[in-house]
């Protein structure tokens, strides 16, 4: 599960650090100024933000995430996955990753996947084209698709990154193939 919203990049911060409390107080003030009906964010287990937000009166749930800090040993990374995630990866052994999906094909695939779920897309085609043009110019985006032996797209994801992190920005999967392990392979 990706981490959405606010997270602290300084790994040296702990929940009893006064800087965390200050950051969270400022964040809570900004939320108040927005006049939102509610605010929802997932925090990774062990995040120093959790206790600080609880102290400010927020209901907070921690969630196990697959925020991968070090990719130097992929075997170790996979060993840390849950049994369910490993089982999904086993199912995906006959599938392959493709990096040749174009932005237009990705958009159409995402629209189709959402339509199957009786949902509508939350961004315009034009927005995605501008985002893609800018991130491609910087060399900071990639579309991954998972295909079967018949070259059908089962799942896809639009990834962007900066010098610190990669973001699994827009994932989508075809409901017909939800049990194929394709979405696990994207991670």
PLM region spans:
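A conserved beta-strand-loop-helix scaffold within acyl/acetyltransferase catalytic domains
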Residues: 43-179
